[in-house]
Amino acid sequence: MFEKKLEPGSESSSFIIGIQPIRPIHLDFAKNRNEKNRNMENPFKFGTIVEEKFFTDRVAEVAYIRQFIMSANHLVLISPRRFGKSSVIMKAVKQTGRQYIMLNLQRVMSVSDLAASLLHEFFKVRPMERLKHLLTHFRIIPTVTTNPVSGTMEVSFQPGVDSSMLLEDVLTLLDRANTEKDRLIVILDEFQEIRDIAPKLDRQMRSIMQAQKNINYILLGSQESMMSDIFENKKSPFYHFGELMRLGKLPRDDFHTYLSERLAGVFADRSDGIADQILDFTGCHPYYSQQLAANVWQVGVLQPETEDAVWAAIDHIVKSHSLDYERLWLSINRTNRWILRQLSMGKALQTGDFQTSTVYSAVKRLQKDGYVVYSDRYELEDPFYRQWILAEK
């Protein structure tokens, strides 16, 4: 246990706070001793697309994206998982007032599934009755039914049909159903998955998309190396397809203000220091900062007598996910465990314990799987998993 006390936000506090073992603080959220605040709404939100009052800063990014998609160009946005790509895009897109559809390619299983999913999403914003004349141009007519439970339109194609023909017909319909003055916005999330859905799918999509005039494409991706290869490799079909934009962490000062103002309702004069503690632990990661702040706020409301609300919240989150963390730890090999432990402790990876090529390959795999991210250095994506590793060491 580290005994040295540091002022929150000081030059060394992020290192010390980031690696000290979890303090044995136990919470019982069932015991609500603060009746006065029990009906207050938690001002922090995580896990879903964040909008309106829960949205954090990103004013410049939103303004840039909104202005950019008012042109006839396409946008490519690269950012690590849980950095808020979808929230930023959705805020900018909604400000344009134009119709849009959004599809996560991680949920797409095949080319025919991609075609059906795009058509399904389009039916949500454009009634099928207004598209019947365009559907007659389909070389393979889809089966469209209404879900009796949700009332939504379900789209499917007969098995065994030419999937590339299906996709071409659907993308052509999306373009023909709109005009240059009122372009449809098509958002494809986790776009790097295009390479795993089917061979040469990227070539087919690029050949269709580059001829369209009535659609703005926004292509999002979380795998830095794969997205860069798709859009910056001269041999790639999508080379220079659109404006390339990278979304980093939130500026600390802006994020601190956001957290402090919302924590003040529970912690009054202590909110500045608590905001610093949160950002020191999370490294200003948007998702995990919101998650920790939400749990700290809960501690302040339900157990206001808790001496260190931040570490109480960290302890609670880590214990809540301990079984998942253990399962993950047991599923990876010893090289990966060593790398995660070294990164958790803030130590170098070039120690001679493993060959440099072995470490490099392992880090790249961990990065692809989402366990490790790189900004100015390699680090664990999940600070709570980092804390679990340190506690188990």
Predicted regions and their residues:
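Conserved Walker B catalytic segment
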Residues: 157-223, 232
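Short, amphipathic alpha-helical interaction segments positioned at domain boundaries
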Residues: 386-393
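A short, basic N-terminal segment
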Residues: 2, 9-75, 80
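Helix-loop-helix "sensor" segment of P-loop NTPases
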Residues: 229-280, 301-304
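Short amphipathic alpha-helical interaction segments
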Residues: 353-369
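Winged-helix-like regulatory helical subdomains adjacent to P-loop NTPase cores
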Residues: 284, 290-357
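P-loop NTPase nucleotide-binding core
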Residues: 71-74, 78-83, 87-184
